[in-house]
């Protein structure tokens, strides 16, 4: 909220809430200037913060400013929004510079219709303890649906100052028949309950009482459930009379009432209620009479429940059944799409039978047309057929065509009669008996060509899970797009693919077409003519060190931060080769030869065995791709080019269970080694470009070498065009610089 809103003091009581404030500023005895605390208190007295609720989600700050500025000078307005989606939460805060303006806005603008919804205005209460006390809060039920917030406020305003008034509404804005009135004092609430409870409002008798928090209501409700006296009986024979019904339950205790529900004609509806005096008698009746046969019917006898309690119990049962079903089919139900139109349930079952026992196989069909529409079309078509037959009879043509079958989409006409057949939607589901069979089917059948079309096979997911994943994917793409826009400000290089454990790459300003270097590698000591910032740990920059824009990137093994040294086999072979290559790359004309000093975690004997640093201009060419004659370092022998030991593969079961961000990382690890074989110099850039595609297409690229090569060639053409454009811009800028030098 704004500074004015933050400086607004909490409303302590009703007098302050309505702007009637007491001047507590006592003049200082000395002539000293007022302290900052005194000035802040004076500022608080001249400001007012209002809470504006029940707002439409489309209401903006500008709309509220236009409304509230008509009262007085507005200091600030803020519509509260969700931190992630930025959608309005339906309420806002309006801050005035004076409490008089706030009081005037509360009186004149309360319940003003904004975007078709009446707003609700009250003083902002910052202390949550005071907001949640509930003192003076009144609950009203059995309200007529014509009573709105304004009418309820006008009705109860006669008994005291109202802080807030609200009628509960559904999604469509219709009254739910109950509401709340929050008074400034408990005395006003008691006065309203005394005079209005049991009175008629719009010809309906209303109940008015103190609002009881839900927690207290639930505790009382549980106590009532434990000491019930009213029981519900169903499956009663229609011939049972009230006397027979009463005699059956009087055997177990004294009852106050026993009745069978009947319709308007007096016929039994098959259920009734019995109310006992004591809870013990009701409990005995439930235990002894439940599931017994009475007049040929097995009775159900149980505690009587209210409607909301039954609905809650049914909801819990449904949720439990849903969770049980979800756990039952977890990992065994497969989703298959890209099916041909002629594939039915039997063909789908035959496709997946070799992988295990199938409990169900279903191809989803399009919904059949409504019967009334079908009947109309059939009648119209019959009329058209009759006209055609009459014309053909007149022309003397044969009627052999009437018996032929003509197919048009999902409509089949046979001898003038039309039948609506469901057409395949192109996807279906197959459920196996155990997860191992399902995993095997996904591995073998995904991307397999069936009748010229590659199948997509994956574990089935619920709609809400897919929706959440889609939202996460969209959010990740938006973040990626923002990162790319930021990178374009520093040279516009496409995003690099970062292997596991590496830090993001940083592009120096003006380094067009060059490979980036890892940012923030600790330990580099800057010297005269120092090498790239963030160099190898402990390495000192020499006079002849290469500039930062020519330094090749340092690829670190997976799971290892830059500047650290790997354990195990990397220490002896692969990492030594990486260290030696870095030594050679950092050599300058004036650099010293010899081993690298002070590398932590490595014996000096191993370091000394490497070649000394020789002078030279190592680096990558600045024009785009690394030329064959360049001094860039080739891939290290013995170290996997994919950035991890062995060739990475894609496990479909693991991939489908991973988060969207992890799925992209796994697919990138699988594609990077293959792209590196085709284009070693630009493998990272190309992988980053391809990862913007959908996961289904990326999975296809991991299995189809020709498709991957085509995508790589396409990416290379885009990159070459980008480099040419950058070089053209540089050539255009060069003559201007030369002309400036000539003038100088």
From Swiss-Prot:
Subcellular location: Cytoplasm; Nucleus
UniProt entry keywords in alphabetical sequence: Cytoplasm, mRNA processing, mRNA transport, Nucleus, Repeat, RNA-binding, Translation regulation, Transport
GO molecular function, one term: mRNA 3'-UTR binding
Keyword Cytoplasm assigned: yes
Domain PABC: 647-724
Domain RRM as annotated: residue spans: 48-126, 136-213, 229-306, 332-462
Region span, Disordered: 1-42, 368-411, 527-550, 607-651, 723-744
Annotated Gly residues bias: 527-545, 609-632, 640-649
Family annotation (SMART domains): PolyA, RRM, RRM_1
Keyword match Cytoplasm: yes
Biased segments, Low complexity type: 33-42
UniProt biased composition (Basic and acidic residues): 376-397
Record-level GO cellular component terms: cytoplasmic stress granule; cytosol; nucleus; ribonucleoprotein complex
Superkingdom as given in the UniProt entry: Eukaryota
Sequence ranges of Polar residues compositional bias: 1-11
PANTHER family hit by this protein: RNA BINDING PROTEIN
Family: Belongs to the polyadenylate-binding protein type-1 family.
Protein name from the UniProt record: Polyadenylate-binding protein, cytoplasmic and nuclear
Species the sequence originates in: Phaeosphaeria nodorum (strain SN15 / ATCC MYA-4574 / FGSC 10173)
Upper lineage: Eukaryota, Fungi, Dikarya, Ascomycota, Pezizomycotina
């Amino acid at each position: 909220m704004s500074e004015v809103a933050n400086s607004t003091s909490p409303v302590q009581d009703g007098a302050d809430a309505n702007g009637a404030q007491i001047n507590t500023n006592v003049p200082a005895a000395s002539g000293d200037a007022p302290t900052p605390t005194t000035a802040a208190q004076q500022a608080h007295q001249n400001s007012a913060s209002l809470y504006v609720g029940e707002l439409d989600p489309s209401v903006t700050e500008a709309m509220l400013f236009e409304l509230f500025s008509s009262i007085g000078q507005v200091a600030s307005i803020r519509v509260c929004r969700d931190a992630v989606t930025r959608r309005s939460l339906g309420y806002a805060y309006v801050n005035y510079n004076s409490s008089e303006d706030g009081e005037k806005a509360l009186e004149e603008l309360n319940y003003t219709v904004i975007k078709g919804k009446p707003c609700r205005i009250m003083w902002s209460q910052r202390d949550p303890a005071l907001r949640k006390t509930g003192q003076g809060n009144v609950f009203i039920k059995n309200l007529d649906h014509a009573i709105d917030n304004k009418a309820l406020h006008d009705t109860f305003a006669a008994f005291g100052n109202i802080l807030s008034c609200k009628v509960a509404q559904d999604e469509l804005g219709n009254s739910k028949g109950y509401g709340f009135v929050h008074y400034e004092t408990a005395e006003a609430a008691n006065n309203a309950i005394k005079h209005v409870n049991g009175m008629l409002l719009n010809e309906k008798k209303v109940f008015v009482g103190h609002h009881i928090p839900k927690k207290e209501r639930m505790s009382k409700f549980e106590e009532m459930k434990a000491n019930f006296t009213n029981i519900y009986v169903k499956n009663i024979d229609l011939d049972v009379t009230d006397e027979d019904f009463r005699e059956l339950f009087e055997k177990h205790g004294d009852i106050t009432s026993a009745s069978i529900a009947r319709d308007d004609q007096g016929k039994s509806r098959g259920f009734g209620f019995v109310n006992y005096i004591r809870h013990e008698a009701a409990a005995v009746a439930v235990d002894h009479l439940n599931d017994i046969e009475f007049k040929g019917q097995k009775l159900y006898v149980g505690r009587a429940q209210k409607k909301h309690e039954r609905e809650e119990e049914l909801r819990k049962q449904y949720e439990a059944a849903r969770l049980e079903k979800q756990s039952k089919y977890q990992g065994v139900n497969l989703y298959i799409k890209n099916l041909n139109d002629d594939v039915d349930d039997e063909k789908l079952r035959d496709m997946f039978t070799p992988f295990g026992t199938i409990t169900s196989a279903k191809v989803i069909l399009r919904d059949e047309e409504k019967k009334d529409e079908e009947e109309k079309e059939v009648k119209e078509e019959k009329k058209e057929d009759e006209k055609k037959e009459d014309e053909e009879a007149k022309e003397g043509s044969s009627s052999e065509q009437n018996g032929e079958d003509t197919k048009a989409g999902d409509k089949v006409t046979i001898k003038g009669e039309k039948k609506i057949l469901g057409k395949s939607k192109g996807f279906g589901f197959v459920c196996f008996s155990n997860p191992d069979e399902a995993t095997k089917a996904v591995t073998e059948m995904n991307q397999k060509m069936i009748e010229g079309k590659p199948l997509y096979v994956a574990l089935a997911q619920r709609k809400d899970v897919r929706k959440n994943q889609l939202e996460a994917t969209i959010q990740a793409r938006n973040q990626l797009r923002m990162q790319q826009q930021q990178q374009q400000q520093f040279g516009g290089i496409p995003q690099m693919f970062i292997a596991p454990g590496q830090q993001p790459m940083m592009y120096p300003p003006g380094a067009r077409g060059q490979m980036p270097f890892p940012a923030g590698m600790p330990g580099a000591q800057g010297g005269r003519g120092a090498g790239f910032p963030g160099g190898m740990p402990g390495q000192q920059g020499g006079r002849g060190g290469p500039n930062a824009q020519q330094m090749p990137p340092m690829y670190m093994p997976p799971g290892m931060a830059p500047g650290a040294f790997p354990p195990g086999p990397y220490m002896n072979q692969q990492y030594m080769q990486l260290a030696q290559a870095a030594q050679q790359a950092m050599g300058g004309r004036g650099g010293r030869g010899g081993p690298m000093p002070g590398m932590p975690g490595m014996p000096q004997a191993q370091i000394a065995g490497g070649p000394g640093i020789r002078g030279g201009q190592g680096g990558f060419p600045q024009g785009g791709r690394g030329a064959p004659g360049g001094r860039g370092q080739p891939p290290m022998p013995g170290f996997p080019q994919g950035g991890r030991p062995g060739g990475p593969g894609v496990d479909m079961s693991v991939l489908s269970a991973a988060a969207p961000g992890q799925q992209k990382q796994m697919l990138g690890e699988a594609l990077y080694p293959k792209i590196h074989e085709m284009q070693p110099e630009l493998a990272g850039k190309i992988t980053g470009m391809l990862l913007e595609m959908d996961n289904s297409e990326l999975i296809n690229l991991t299995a189809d070498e020709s498709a991957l090569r085509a995508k790589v060639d396409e990416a290379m053409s885009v990159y070459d065009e980008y480099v040419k454009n950058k070089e053209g811009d540089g050539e255009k800028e060069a003559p201007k610089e030369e002309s400036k030098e000539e003038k100088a």
